[in-house]
């Protein structure tokens, strides 16, 4: 079988971009079991409840749901187990320092295969207040309406 090239998206956490202000992003490798990789290759995963915790100098991904592999036997994995993230020491120290200082949290944004290896995009994020969410939604809607108006104007259709 030919080696995979490029990036193949498995799961995306759209809720994280809605609930948090994203400050910085990192790409991390994942330590996975065989049946987890097979389940991911089927495109089955959920990042909705996921978060990253740094414990004794190691980054761990919690709450990510990778369902059991359908053809797996007794060697199948637990669906919501914690998984170790592979990051450089400098990155782990920087993330830990910023989380402790500024009260930020670390959330997963996307899970994908990059050149055949499972990767997760994690982000340092700060929680949005409910009025922030409403303001962002209103701004997005206003931008959409102006783009539609410009598009209609360019096509010759007047309001």
From Swiss-Prot:
Disordered: annotated segments: 137-159
Name of the protein in question: SsrA-binding protein
Transmembrane segments: none
Primary residence: cytoplasm
Amino acid composition bias (Basic and acidic residues), ranges on this chain: 137-147
NCBIfam families: PRK05422.1, smpB
Compartments (UniProt record): Cytoplasm
Function comment: Required for rescue of stalled ribosomes mediated by trans-translation. Binds to transfer-messenger RNA (tmRNA), required for stable association of tmRNA with ribosomes. tmRNA and SmpB together mimic tRNA shape, replacing the anticodon stem-loop with SmpB. tmRNA is encoded by the ssrA gene; the 2 termini fold to resemble tRNA(Ala) and it encodes a 'tag peptide', a short internal open reading frame. During trans-translation Ala-aminoacylated tmRNA acts like a tRNA, entering the A-site of stalled ribosomes, displacing the stalled mRNA.
Native source species: Nocardioides sp. (strain ATCC BAA-499 / JS614)
Gene: smpB
